[in-house]
UniProtKB/Swiss-Prot annotation:
Subcellular localization, as worded in the UniProt entry: Cell membrane
Protein name: Protein VirD4
Pfam family for this entry, one: T4SS-DNA_transf
Membrane topology: Multi-pass membrane protein
Family: Belongs to the VirD4/TraG family.
Keyword Zinc: no
InterPro entries on file: P-loop_NTPase, T4SS-coupling_protein, TraG/VirD4
Lineage of producing organism: Bacteria, Pseudomonadati, Pseudomonadota, Alphaproteobacteria, Hyphomicrobiales
A GO cellular component annotation in the UniProt record: plasma membrane
Source species of the chain: Rhizobium radiobacter
Disulfide bonds: none
Transmembrane segments: 12-32, 67-87, 153-173
Length: 688
């Protein structure tokens, strides 16, 4: 604590000192005005200027006016220096302050609605007034910390979904985001998808995370599968940590084997390992059958282990996440892909990951897998010229997903690939329980916009108070002498205090929020309420029509053997086409999806092979078979999907079709744009 005289006395002393310095400087001028020599030095008098004043001479000489100028300039220079030093000393306890609206508007964080491109976090005024909205400016990632019923949904999540200009992947824990915003997203031109594997009415789009790996070159498949395994299979308890690597190896080998067999789904991996019998015999058999060297090596190693060890590996594999695919709903929802991650930057897409609070912990492995793959695919290549849309990951109830190593790493790099994260948690302790200190600090240091609403825990208010910092203020104290009450001493000292104390954070009213922005002073803003905001309310109420719900997912009553038998009949339907197909495969194996079909390759409609599409078993709506030996690959689309489904058929690459029943050339990537009625089943062959 520094004590000093009262402020007026200090100012008076500073003025006196500056005038004295100016008077001395003027005396130096008077003494040395004719030259700097030894005689002048010997005759120097500090009162030399006094002898040139009108008070001494009786008139104002030219030397006096010049000396007076020296006094004025010197005094001002000395006084300014004293003030600068004094102001610096006053800030040594801190310079924290609240940001001003003007400076935040100039920096691009506060924008009018018409200029909003990023998320919406708050507003400068109440809902009935035209104010500026807080967006993230140049900061790609954000963190929202708000307890239950604090208004993060109506104030941040829903306004962001109504206004964000790019693609969005939204974790919709309650399902209300899809109901409240999907029509607005669709009206703005988004392709809207709802991924809800455990929906009570089975209304869900599908996503197969293995399909992307199956379309990669063989030399890339092992690495991507290991990445998939690391995010899906997690150790449940300390006892499982010693077996987690082996469990992940088993998963990798299972994926590679299923890709090789033409059943690239995690459900097929579950069925593969769920076969009855001794596991070492199963692994030995798989090692003999597999043509993939990595899968062979893993199965060989496993087959040589003791039965108890193998049981531990398979148990950790199942408990770590694979047992989720015992549910037929999960199997069906991950049997095909209705949307492509590669389209997220190319065209506006909104994917709602709808999970009820009761199912969130259960589906956490699948959600982790999905986010890992989304992040991985986005970072495989820099955005091209036609990939102009940013991708926002809107992660509500982020804590319940468990530890996401892929996102923990990607938060430092994905901004360069047009990726953004918005993490929503109830308190900072949610990060503490899931990530270690280094991981927690990684999230806090890389989220450039942090929004806090009133919270009752201990950690969050303390963090906010420390992050805002302290300011310096003048503390005045008065002491009295015991001898006389009129004899007293007043002291003023510089002290520091928190701009916002932890208890003040807890007392934050329901309409306010605190925002920390990297490199900027803190902000205290009004919360947004979309249902009462004069701009957002109109946008919300303009939504019309029905929800863009997907068709109910069909669960098959047919056995796998029946499906394979039916597929075998189809594969042998046109034996004579095989030689021609091989020829075309050699000539046109590199034709890209969507390219014009070469003139000498044509689709032939076999009228004699037409049949009623209703006779196709529901299984065939999502089944595919690759028969490389006969030179053919066959895809079947059931009656519910014949006019709109995307069929991924792989004999080395993916092909998108819109047909009832198509026969492709082996290895080819040809696209037929004809669409046939639901009542007709058409067989196509390619010939030269």
């Amino acid at each position: 604590m520094n004590s000093s005289k009262t402020s007026p006395q200090r100012m008076t002393l500073s003025i006196v000192c500056s005038l004295a310095a100016g008077f001395c400087a003027a005396s130096c001028y008077v003494t040395f005005r004719r030259g700097f020599n030894g005689e002048a030095i010997m005759t120097f008098d500090v009162f030399a200027f006094w002898y040139e004043t009108p008070l001494y001479l009786g008139y104002a000489s030219t030397v006096f006016w010049r000396g007076l100028s020296v006094v004025i300039f010197t005094s001002l220079a000395v006084l300014s220096s004293q003030l600068i030093i004094s102001l610096r000393n006053q800030k040594h306890h801190g310079t924290a302050r609240w940001a001003e609206i003007g400076e935040m508007q100039h920096a691009g964080y506060l924008q009018r609605y018409s200029r909003i491109k990023g998320p919406i976090f708050g507003k400068t005024c109440g809902p009935l007034w035209f104010g500026s909205y807080l967006t993230n400016g140049e900061q790609p990632h954000s963190l929202v910390v708000a307890p239950t019923r604090a208004g993060k949904g109506v104030g941040i999540v829903i306004p962001t979904l109504l206004t964000f200009k790019g693609s969005v992947i939204a974790l919709d824990v309650k399902g209300e985001l899809f109901e409240l915003t999907s029509r607005a997203r669709k009206a703005s031109g988004d392709a809207v998808f709802k991924f809800s594997p455990l929906d009570s009415e089975r209304k869900t789009h599908c996503y197969n995370p293995v399909l992307d790996i199956a379309t990669l070159p063989p030399e890339r498949q092992f690495t991507e599968t290991r990445r998939l395994a690391a995010n899906l299979i997690t150790a449940k308890g300390k006892g499982a940590e010693g077996f987690i690597d082996g469990a992940r190896d088993l998963f990798v080998a299972g994926i590679l084997t299923c890709i090789e067999r033409g059943t690239p789904t995690i459900g097929a991996v579950y069925d593969l390992f769920a076969q009855p019998g001794e596991k070492y015999k199963l692994f030995a058999q798989l090692a003999e059958e597999s043509l993939n060297k990595e899968a062979q090596r893993i199965f060989d190693n496993m087959a040589g282990n003791d039965t108890k060890i193998l049981t531990s590996y398979t148990s950790v594999l199942g408990d770590g996440g694979l047992n989720l695919w015992a549910d037929p709903l999960i199997k069906a929802a991950t049997s095909r892909s209705d949307f492509s991650v590669y389209d997220l930057r190319r065209k506006k897409t909104c994917i709602y990951l709808c999970v009820s609070p009761n199912d969130l912990e259960v589906l956490a492995p699948l959600m982790r897998l999905l986010f890992q793959q989304l992040v991985s695919i986005l970072q495989r290549s820099l955005p091209g010229k036609d990939e102009c849309h940013e991708v926002l990951f809107l992660l509500d109830e982020f804590k319940h997903l468990g530890k996401l190593e892929a996102i923990e790493t990607a938060i430092t790099t994905i901004a360069g690939y047009k990726g953004r994260f918005m993490f929503i948690i109830q308190s900072l302790s949610a990060l503490t329980g899931t990530y270690d200190d280094a991981g927690k600090q990684n999230f806090l240091s890389n989220t450039g916009v942090q929004v806090f609403m009133a919270t009752a825990d201990d950690e969050t208010p303390t963090y906010i108070s420390k992050a805002i910092g302290e300011y310096t203020f003048k503390a005045r104290s008065t002491s009295y002498s015991q001898a006389s009450m009129f004899d007293h001493n007043i002291q003023i000292s510089d002290q520091g205090a928190a701009l916002l104390r932890p208890e003040q954070v807890r007392l934050l009213d329901d309409q306010s929020e605190i925002v920390l922005i990297k490199g900027r002073p803190p902000l205290k803003l009004r919360k947004v309420q979309y249902y009462s905001d004069r701009t957002l309310k109109r946008l919300f109420e303009r939504q019309m029509g029905s929800l863009p719900e997907p068709a109910p997912l069909m669960l098959s009553d047919y056995s796998n053997d029946q499906v394979q038998s039916h597929l075998a009949e189809i594969a042998n339907f046109n034996e004579d086409a095989a030689p021609r197909n091989r020829t075309v495969a050699e000539d046109h194996g590199s034709v890209k999806v969507g390219a014009d079909i070469p003139e000498r390759v044509m689709g032939i409609n076999g009228d004699e092979d037409q049949a009623d599409a209703r006779e196709i078993p529901p299984e065939l709506g999502c089944a595919s078979r690759i028969d490389a030996g006969s030179g053919r690959s066959t895809a079947i689309v059931g009656p519910d999907y014949c006019t709109s489904a995307k069929i991924e058929v792989r004999t080395g690459t993916a092909c998108e079709m819109k047909l009832n029943w198509v026969q492709f050339v082996s290895g080819g990537m040809l696209r037929f744009d004809k669409v046939y009625a639901r009542s007709q089943l058409s067989l196509y062959e390619v010939s030269v």
